[in-house]
Amino acid sequence: FIAFIHFGPNTFTRMEWGNGMEDPRIFDLKNLDTDQWCAAMKEAGMTKVILTAKHHDGFVLWQSRYTQHGIMSSGFQDGKGDIMKELSASCQKYGLKLGIYLSPADLYQIESPEGLYGNLSKYTKRTIPKEVPGRPFANKTTFEFELDDYNEYFMSQLFELLTEYGPIDEVWFDGAHPK
């Protein structure tokens, strides 16, 4: 018995899907109490919660190094909020497992005229995570892959989530192609 939380700009637009061009300020979250969420889940007998950390619109619910399309550009806690961090702490406090839903589709990152994600760059050897000046990782593990620009971005976001938010019990990949 698990909880699945789909929470993002669509919470405020009342649309089923976003298009990746929503103004992040539309995410007008005033209060967040993940302890209340987890206490209610625990009382209901749930053992795990999966959070949609990023849906197809590309809006992220954590302080990612790799995009500005997320809570860092919203008014939530003056752009300093981190829903993943708060939920992870609450899950640990209440003994719940935490899973993440991370969409490989990202409508905010469409750059090619064919409507594909990214810029159709060539596959080259890349190190994951991609370094970002001033934002080092505590975890010094790196991986090398043959990737294009978009997949370097996606894999670096996945690395953030798997190394900075405590135990992650499940990763749910889902996707949709714009064509």
Language model features with spans:
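Mature catalytic domains of secreted/periplasmic carbohydrate-active enzymes
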Residues: F1-K179
